[in-house]
């Protein structure tokens, strides 16, 4: 059994799919996709191959995570709408990794984070564990490390200057309260949220971004994470 980690799957979230290169022919894959759709008198979801994006994300997970492995998704499963959640759960339930081996940490697009009950029952049918934050051990077979799990970067990172290539809401003040404060230098954190294309977008090397953009749109194994923490 191996633990795998990812974040920001954004199933059935056409805007994010566009940013990831899935705009249809005739449209540009960037953050102007809403404006492009408006000018074409279309909905964003009709301008983007979001279903191809979702199939690719699902296929990449199934190519990596087996039926005896554990999968941790650190938030932003979908856009947050009922339509998006419905499609997301279809993909989650198609994973080779069984329900009891799936863990969900809630992100800012997951309404349950804010105490809302909408969709919670459906989430419990697809995941064996759901929480705002978590903690688990990771190992490479020799070294064992304890890591915190949160959708968001360290709370202190919210005060840092903006970094190119990150989501516009990466340091949104109202999200700060959901982030974990780093109370000790030995604390290690796995997170997502920023959509950065590198696992180390912040100076603090005791946190690793497991978001899809940082890992070529695939989950990352616990052994690889242990190696990275040891290098830093």
Language-model-detected regions and their locations in the chain:
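Active-site environment of divalent metal-dependent phosphoester hydrolases
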Residues: 10-17, 78-82, 108-116, 155-158, ...
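Active-site neighborhood of phospho(di)ester-bond hydrolases with catalytic His/Asp-centered motifs
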Residues: 6-7, 71-76, 102-108, 149-150, ...
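Core catalytic region of metal-dependent phosphoesterases/phosphodiesterases
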Residues: 2, 11, 15-138
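Conserved beta-sheet core of the metallophosphoesterase superfamily
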Residues: 125-232
